[in-house]
Swiss-Prot record:
Disulfide bonds: none annotated. The lineage of its organism: Eukaryota, Metazoa, Chordata, Craniata, Vertebrata. InterPro entries: His_Pase_superF_clade-1, His_PPase_superfam, Mito_Ser/Thr_phosphatase. GO terms for biological process: programmed cell death. This is Serine/threonine-protein phosphatase PGAM5, mitochondrial. Signal peptide: none annotated. The gene is pgam5. The keyword Transcription does not apply.
Length: 278
């Protein structure tokens, strides 16, 4: 009976995946506009999708290889093999204040206040006492400079960069705002930022034994979109939140796929005169 239920669940997931991949292959959704596979964002339903990251153990097993009548013990072995054990702690840091009048990204360096903010954020992260595993930062100048300053307080933490975390317009916001953008902007940026979510935000690998503490240093739009997606809230709501420069948001992903938000845009560790939102 357990196996039969698993096969049904697996079949539903496979059918949904096949439908999406099929639509992507022909470049169009049924009766709709062009479809980019990375832009397919599940609609918020009010029900928690346990397999939101496609890493639920049952979806990691090739059910067609399991004997439908006698394979329950074999299935359980496979499920145990793919069951995560560790919790992932993910800190999302918005870059510090920068010179917005720069003509190119290279010119948009941190302001003196921005450097102070990054220093305060680095001290705050260090004071939390976590054993951080990795820092990943956006390749944009303001994020790179923020990372350099924060890293002074976390000298032994390895660092790497990712273009996926660059700033952009993830999805047309609701309610709509006055600074209109053409559809192609969301079409291009949205695919990349959705890819960033799928790449960085998921439950731990089954091989991971200990809890991990990871830092992503990037941009307000990226962080707000990731938070909406991680909590399975309508992603169009991303612009309803404000994040101060150098602020800390904190997601926790449990082995069973449950996600909680412990901080959103925390900048209470900064003196009031050091806070900005550029």
């Amino acid at each position: 009976m357990y196996l039969r239920k698993a096969l049904i669940a697996g079949g539903s997931a496979a059918a949904a995946a096949a439908a999406i991949l099929g639509a992507a292959a022909v470049g169009k959704s049924k009766g709709g506009p062009d479809l980019d596979i990375l832009s397919v964002v599940p609609a918020a339903t009010g029900q928690w999708d346990r397999n939101w990251d496609r890493r639920e153990p049952i979806s990691m097993v090739n059910l067609s290889k399991i004997n439908g009548e006698t394979g329950e013990e074999e299935l359980q072995l496979h499920l145990n093999k793919h069951k995560p054990k560790a919790t992932r702690h993910i800190f999302l840091i918005r870059h510090s204040q920068y010179k917005q009048d720069g003509k190119t990204d290279f010119d948009r360096v941190l302001t003196p206040l921005g450097r102070e903010q990054a220093d305060l954020t680095g001290k705050r992260l260090s004071s939390l006492g976590f054993k951080y595993n990795h820092i990943v930062y956006s390749t944009m100048t303001r994020a790179k400079e923020t990372t350099e300053i924060i890293s002074k307080y976390l000298p032994d933490v390895k660092k790497s960069s990712s273009d996926l975390l660059r700033e952009g317009a993830p999805i047309r916001p609701e309610p709509q705002v006055c600074h209109w953008k053409p559809d192609f902007v969301y079409y291009e940026d949205g695919s990349r930022i959705e890819a960033a979510f799928r790449h960085f935000i998921h439950r731990a690998d089954p091989k991971q034994e200990a809890d991990s503490y990871e830092i992503l240093i990037c941009h307000a739009n990226v962080i707000r979109y990731i938070v909406c997606r991680a909590l399975q809230l309508p992603p169009e709501a991303w612009l309803r939140m404000f994040l101060n420069n150098g602020s800390i948001s904190y997601l926790v992903i449990r082995p069973n796929g449950n996600v909680s938000l412990r901080m959103l845009g925390d900048s209470g560790f900064m003196p009031p005169e050091k806070i900005s939102r550029t």
